[in-house]
Curated annotation (Swiss-Prot):
<dbReference type="GO" id="GO:0043874">
    <property type="term" value="F:acireductone synthase activity"/>
</dbReference>
<keyword id="KW-0539">Nucleus</keyword>
<keyword id="KW-0963">Cytoplasm</keyword>
<feature type="binding site">
    <location>
        <position position="13"/>
    </location>
    <ligand>
        <name>Mg(2+)</name>
    </ligand>
</feature>
<dbReference type="InterPro" id="IPR023214">
    <property type="entry name" value="HAD_sf"/>
</dbReference>
<feature type="binding site">
    <location>
        <begin position="133"/>
        <end position="134"/>
    </location>
    <ligand>
        <name>substrate</name>
    </ligand>
</feature>
<keyword id="KW-0460">Magnesium</keyword>
<dbReference type="GO" id="GO:0005634">
    <property type="term" value="C:nucleus"/>
</dbReference>
<keyword id="KW-0486">Methionine biosynthesis</keyword>
<comment type="function">
    <text>Bifunctional enzyme that catalyzes the enolization of 2,3-diketo-5-methylthiopentyl-1-phosphate (DK-MTP-1-P) into the intermediate 2-hydroxy-3-keto-5-methylthiopentenyl-1-phosphate (HK-MTPenyl-1-P), which is then dephosphorylated to form the acireductone 1,2-dihydroxy-3-keto-5-methylthiopentene (DHK-MTPene).</text>
</comment>
<keyword id="KW-0028">Amino-acid biosynthesis</keyword>
<comment type="pathway">
    <text>Amino-acid biosynthesis; L-methionine biosynthesis via salvage pathway; L-methionine from S-methyl-5-thio-alpha-D-ribose 1-phosphate: step 4/6.</text>
</comment>
<dbReference type="InterPro" id="IPR036412">
    <property type="entry name" value="HAD-like_sf"/>
</dbReference>
<feature type="binding site">
    <location>
        <position position="170"/>
    </location>
    <ligand>
        <name>substrate</name>
    </ligand>
</feature>
<comment type="pathway">
    <text>Amino-acid biosynthesis; L-methionine biosynthesis via salvage pathway; L-methionine from S-methyl-5-thio-alpha-D-ribose 1-phosphate: step 3/6.</text>
</comment>
<dbReference type="GO" id="GO:0000287">
    <property type="term" value="F:magnesium ion binding"/>
</dbReference>
<keyword id="KW-0378">Hydrolase</keyword>
Length: 239
């Protein structure tokens, strides 16, 4: 690891990489489910809610109960689709604003992000940190604005955000090529992608990026063959 060339861009996954998988599964998703009925009852005809309702397929947006049933079904099956992600982000925004939600970053994350970005402009230093997650870009920004770090808001250190809408599926090499193409001044080989998902790491590598599997507490155990053929880290301090 130490001999690897320092990247110019670090591209970070979120769930299982910068925060525990359990935060999304056991905190964010249940919060959205619990907040959904009252939000639909109070805001169904509100202008601010109209675009979220309109994004759902017409057959599921005719009544609050129909939309709620469809949203619950999608969340139960962990379907990653844009209109659901947008609705979840809207629901989470209120939770973050009230203090009910706060993203529990692994303790090495905030210091390392600050270290990477403070090295901008130095020879061999990292100039940019970016995010690529299946969660919507607005939800990503909310998470990094309300973290357990000190200070809690990390958004000033993050240059750009990508999701499955503006970049594409995370297991397809073309998505990483699309991300890198937005910054043509940085060759793909000078990007470092960090994720707990082996298929995502393989896709990024196929697109020419350096990529590492991040093995965090609570993540599924990695097969031995993965450790033999891919870079694996347990903390950003190893980078």
């Amino acid at each position: 690891m130490a001999a690897a060339k320092k990247p110019r861009v670090v591209l970070l996954d979120i769930e299982g990489t910068v925060c525990p998988i359990s935060f999304v599964k056991d905190v964010l998703f249940p919060y959205a489910l619990s907040a959904l009925p009252s939000t639909l009852a109070q805001e169904w005809d509100a202008p601010a809610f109209a675009r979220y309702r309109a994004a759902f397929p017409a057959e599921h947006a005719s009544t609050p109960s129909a939309l709620a049933a469809h949203a619950r079904d999608l969340m139960a099956r962990d379907v990653k689709i844009g209109y659901l992600k947008a609705l979840q982000g809207y629901l989470w925004e209120a939770g973050y604003a009230s203090g009910a939600l706060r993203a529990p970053l692994f303790e090495d994350v905030a210091p390392k992000v600050r270290e990477w970005t403070s090295a901008a402009g130095e020879e061999g230093g990292v100039a940019r940190v970016m995010i690529y997650s299946s969660g919507s870009v607005p939800a990503q920004k909310l998470l990094f604005r309300h973290t357990s770090g000190e200070p809690a808001d990390l958004t000033d250190a993050i240059t750009d955000y990508f999701d499955t809408v503006n970049a594409g599926p995370k297991t397809e090499p073309a998505s990483y090529e699309r991300i890198a193409a937005k910054y043509p001044e940085v060759p793909a080989g000078e990007w470092l992608f960090l994720s707990d998902n082996v298929r995502e790491v393989e896709a990024a590598r196929e697109a020419g990026m350096r990529a590492c599997v991040v093995q965090r507490p609570g993540n599924a155990e990695l097969p031995e063959d993965v450790r033999g053929r891919l870079e694996v880290v347990e903390s950003f301090e190893e980078l």
